UniProtKB/Swiss-Prot annotation:
Protein name per its UniProtKB record: Small ribosomal subunit protein bS21c
Chloroplast keyword on record: yes
Transit peptide: 1-79
TM helices/strands, residue ranges: none
UniProt-annotated stretches for the region Disordered: 14-49, 124-180
Gene Ontology BP terms: translation
Gene Ontology MF, one: structural constituent of ribosome
Biased segments, Basic residues type: 130-147
GO CC terms, sorted: chloroplast; ribonucleoprotein complex; ribosome
């Protein structure tokens, strides 16, 4: 019995407390610029979950949380570059087809569809290495090929020179008879 109570005391930071703090009206998100120098760890709270509250570092040390459950150490921290995967700004009087093509190009560039397909199934380490190797090969082949430039400029000049030489040649039979 004593061992279970000491275990419960040790794991108490993982369980919500019975004392309820007044719920905040809007969720609180950490500032991405101050994540490294942050004094307090912040939990996301809403009216639906009254037992989720802001926890001070002095109350529950972060080192203990990282040791007990490392995957949950930064579970409440949100990392993102922007609010959207792809963002296309619409110009005034822009054609719908052009807008749709720009959106499709941005989605392909961001790799949103490929990421969705990849996340659909579990991928072990070997499959992940294969996928990354394939993606790197695609990127490198695109770099090697470069953009399509059409016919080579040297070829056009060579054909023009041949036409001038053909004009100087006379393969017609002379009007007179053969001398022999």
């Amino acid at each position: 019995m004593a061992s279970t109570s000491s275990l419960l005391n040790f794991l108490s930071p993982l369980f919500p407390s019975n004392t309820s703090l007044p719920p905040s009206s809007n969720p609180k998100f950490p500032n991405p610029n101050s994540l490294s120098s942050q004094q307090n760890s912040i939990s996301i709270s809403s009216k639906k979950h009254e037992n989720a509250a802001i926890a001070k570092k002095e109350e529950y040390p972060g080192d203990l949380m990282a040791v007990v459950c490392p995957s949950l150490a930064f579970s409440n921290t949100l990392y993102f570059r922007s609010a959207y995967n792809v963002q296309v700004l619409v110009d005034d009087n822009e054609n719908e087809e052009r807008l749709l093509n720009r959106f499709r190009r941005e989605v392909m560039r961001a790799g949103v569809i490929q990421e969705c397909k990849r996340r659909r199934y579990f991928e072990n380490k070997q499959e992940e290495k294969k996928r990354k190797h394939r993606e790197a090969a695609k990127r490198n082949s695109r770099r090697r090929r470069g953009p399509f430039r059409g016919p080579f400029p040297g070829k056009e000049e060579a054909t023009k020179v041949d036409k001038k030489e053909d004009d100087g040649d006379n393969w017609d039979m002379p009007e007179g008879g053969a001398p022999f």
